[in-house]
Amino acid sequence: STMYVGGNFTGVKQGDKGTEISSRGLAAFDVATGDFTGQTFDFNAQVKALLALPDGRLLVGGDFTRVNGEAHSGTVVINPSTGQIDPSWDLQITNALRGGTVSVRALTYYDGNVYMGGAFTHLSGGGSSRVYARNAGRVSLSGRPDRSWNPEISGAVQAVGVSEANSAFYAGGHFTTAHGNQRAWYAAKFSTQPGAAVDTDFDFVPSSATAGKYQQTIATAGNRVYIGGSEHNLFGYDTATNQRVSGAMTFNNGGDLQATTVSAKGVIYGSCHCSDAAYQDMYVWSMNGSWSRVDEIKWVGAWDAATGESLKWTP
């Protein structure tokens, strides 16, 4: 098996004394040994998101416009067996806003479609051209955009997820409205049916009324969806009732949640720029005493995906 790492780098070196091999933006490693596989890539800008497709191909999203010398705006598909670009994926993404640049920052798969979020306005591919998809959209596994589904989110999307429990699409980011004037306050819930209707009963409440509010992680697990970001929060919501049912925050050298993933054993692992403590049952970005327990955290923490309770683990 192969593990891919994407980001903002220019090369790979095996060990401290190894020779650096040029591979810009994406690198591949053998899962069993940790060794570099030798596959090399040349992305002209940062890779932001990776998604393993059901058929084994790797979908890569990011800020790039060229990959290995070819034009690929925002996404490209890689064949993991060879490390070569899949030419059948012809999705091209544009941003028609004045001065706008394309960025695909989040990817997820659900029920035959790839859902994506970022900064863009239109999708073209698979025989369809200039499909309006404001900062979020979905495409088939062949890269054909779905013209019927456009949440029309007002600002850049940082995270996306679809819950198996309720078939709803969740997004987090730098936005406040959707579909023109409907409230979508930094995190929002949408139908996956045509029209992408906003669930107006879902009301995300940030941890601060005056400081940062943007959200940048979404993790779904059973009947819970977990939303993390600024300021310093990981909040859990019940997918059936839309009620917030758990909360954790990081202090004093705390930091915003930046990435989360759910393991096969039901553990949420979350990374943050935090090196002090995680406070359970805290919902407001203030040391006001409203918490039930405090645990050490060093850059990565673990929570029970069923309850949102801290597992008291950190590297």
Predicted regions and their residues:
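Extracytoplasmic surface signature
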Residues: S1-P315
